[in-house]
From Swiss-Prot:
Residue segments, region Disordered: 1-54
Gene encoding the protein: rplO
The protein's name: Large ribosomal subunit protein uL15
Matches recorded under Gene3D superfamilies: 3.100.10.10
Family classification: Belongs to the universal ribosomal protein uL15 family.
Naturally occurring in which organism (per UniProt): Clostridium botulinum (strain Eklund 17B / Type B)
Amino acid sequence: MKLHELQPAAGSRKAPKRVGRGTGSGLGRNAGKGEKGQNARSGGGVRPGFEGGQMPLYRRLPKRGFTNIFAKRYVSINVDRLNIFENGTEITPEVLLERRVVSKVLDGVKILGNGNLEKSLIVKGCKFSKSAIEKIEAAGGKVEVI
């Protein structure tokens, strides 16, 4: 098979509805827009959320909370994700980013204790849960808490 021979699966592509092209087509005359009124006009219709003049839901409900601009956001990973490294490797957030264990480092990396760790590693510059520290040290590794 060549690139120019590729075809969509049978029945997966529907022909577009061509409206306003004569009464014989079944979609002539009013082109599926009914009779007169706001929705029959060009550009007709109401904006999203408009409820006919009634106070809309998004304005009836009160505002709640705020965004703390000082909040620290951490990317969390589990200890079993660290098994891709060799024994004795020094792991930092930069190394995790480089090896694509994490896609971005926001305000840091937090390592959680889900799963098992089989490698002895030195982990620096991260935050840890208690269970993660226990598992890293049980595997013969070291933890340097920030």
